[in-house]
Amino acid sequence: MAFDKDVFLTALDSMTVLELNDLVKAIEEKFGVSAAAMAAPAAASGPGAAVVEEKTEFNVLLTEAGANKVSVIKAVREITGLGLKEAKDLVDGAPKNVKEGIAKADAEAAVKKLLDAGAKAELK
């Protein structure tokens, strides 16, 4: 069977965010690689100078759906833009990241929305 790049790209285009996430994880496991971007080494500013970088990207982790699962699914849909089935699967699969690599203010707002819906969520 010959590899057809166009068919592959079309298949990728039709996948949901959750399916793409599962694909990335499978590729990472299969080939022993990481999808994380490589950071350039920081230039040394002198001996003993400690550089403390403030974290700029945060992940919103749903740890538990809680008693009011319907409200949590609605909150997840608002935060992520996922469809009903994808949001339900994400909530059922807790603990899972709801959003990854977002700004601190957006992450805090998402955690607050999940907590208000009755879920247990963390900012990572």
UniProtKB/Swiss-Prot annotation:
Q: Does the keyword Cytoplasm apply?
A: no
Q: Which PANTHER family match?
A: 39S RIBOSOMAL PROTEIN L12 (PTHR45987), LARGE RIBOSOMAL SUBUNIT PROTEIN BL12M (PTHR45987:SF4)
Question: What keywords appear on the UniProt entry?
Answer: Ribonucleoprotein, Ribosomal protein
Query: Per the UniProt entry, what species is this protein from, by scientific name?
Result: Verminephrobacter eiseniae (strain EF01-2)
Q: Which Gene3D superfamilies is this protein grouped with?
A: 3.30.1390.10, Single helix bin (1.20.5.710)
Q: How does it assemble?
A: Homodimer. Part of the ribosomal stalk of the 50S ribosomal subunit. Forms a multimeric L10(L12)X complex, where L10 forms an elongated spine to which 2 to 4 L12 dimers bind in a sequential fashion. Binds GTP-bound translation factors.
Q: Could you tell me what this protein does?
A: Forms part of the ribosomal stalk which helps the ribosome interact with GTP-bound translation factors. Is thus essential for accurate translation.
Please tell me whether the keyword Ribosomal protein is annotated for this protein: yes
Alphabetized NCBIfam families for the sequence: L12
Q: Which domain of life is it from?
A: Bacteria
Q: CDD domains, per this entry?
A: Ribosomal_L7_L12 (cd00387)
Assigned protein family: Belongs to the bacterial ribosomal protein bL12 family.
Question: In its UniProt record, which GO terms are filed under biological process?
Answer: translation
* Protein name, as recorded: Large ribosomal subunit protein bL12
Cellular compartments per GO CC: cytosolic large ribosomal subunit
The molecular function terms in GO held by this entry are: mRNA binding; structural constituent of ribosome
